[in-house]
């Protein structure tokens, strides 16, 4: 007597947004790219992990490039043409993600580094002994 479960999914409507903000969050382990409108509502996102990279390959510049291209293409489907870029974090995928967004065909108007700087805040992790 099990019923077939039918799911009703909301169709993704195509938003016509001319300009947006690309938030590139690059850590030592991963790179995440979120493209939002000017108010901060998310349009598209991607990360190195969602592109199929695992482990230490997520932190490579190539993984960040593929993630940025994926998020950029999704945003272009919604009509985004110009981007402001906010880069955050110390990772190696910052520059390659920025170049990939430009290569997709966006007109990049500004690039800002919004990495938080601690003023003698938390104690940093211990030095690695290799």
Curated annotation (Swiss-Prot):
InterPro entries, alphabetized: Ribosomal_uS11, Ribosomal_uS11_bac-type, Ribosomal_uS11_CS, Ribosomal_uS11_sf
Gene Ontology cellular component list: ribonucleoprotein complex; ribosome
Presence of the UniProt keyword Cell membrane in the record: no
UniProt keywords, alphabetically: Ribonucleoprotein, Ribosomal protein, RNA-binding, rRNA-binding
Any one GO molecular-function label of the UniProt entry: structural constituent of ribosome
BP term (GO), one: translation
PANTHER family according to UniProt: 40S RIBOSOMAL PROTEIN S14/30S RIBOSOMAL PROTEIN S11
Binding partners and assembly: Part of the 30S ribosomal subunit. Interacts with proteins S7 and S18. Binds to IF-3.
HAMAP family noted in UniProt: Ribosomal_uS11
Protein's job: Located on the platform of the 30S subunit, it bridges several disparate RNA helices of the 16S rRNA. Forms part of the Shine-Dalgarno cleft in the 70S ribosome.
Family statement: Belongs to the universal ribosomal protein uS11 family.
UniProt name for this protein: Small ribosomal subunit protein uS11
């Amino acid at each position: 007597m099990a019923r077939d479960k039918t799911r009703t999914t909301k169709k993704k409507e195509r938003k016509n947004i001319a300009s947006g903000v690309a938030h590139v969050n690059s850590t030592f382990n991963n790179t995440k790219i979120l493209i939002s409108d000017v108010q901060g509502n998310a349009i598209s996102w991607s990360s190195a992990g969602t592109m199929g990279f695992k482990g230490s390959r997520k932190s490579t510049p190539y993984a960040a490039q593929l993630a940025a291209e994926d998020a950029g293409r999704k945003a272009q489907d919604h009509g985004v043409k110009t981007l402001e870029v906010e880069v955050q974090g110390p990772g190696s995928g910052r520059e390659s993600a920025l170049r990939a967004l430009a290569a997709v065909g966006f007109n990049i108007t500004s690039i800002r580094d919004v990495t938080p700087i601690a003023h003698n805040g938390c104690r940093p992790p211990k030095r690695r002994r290799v």
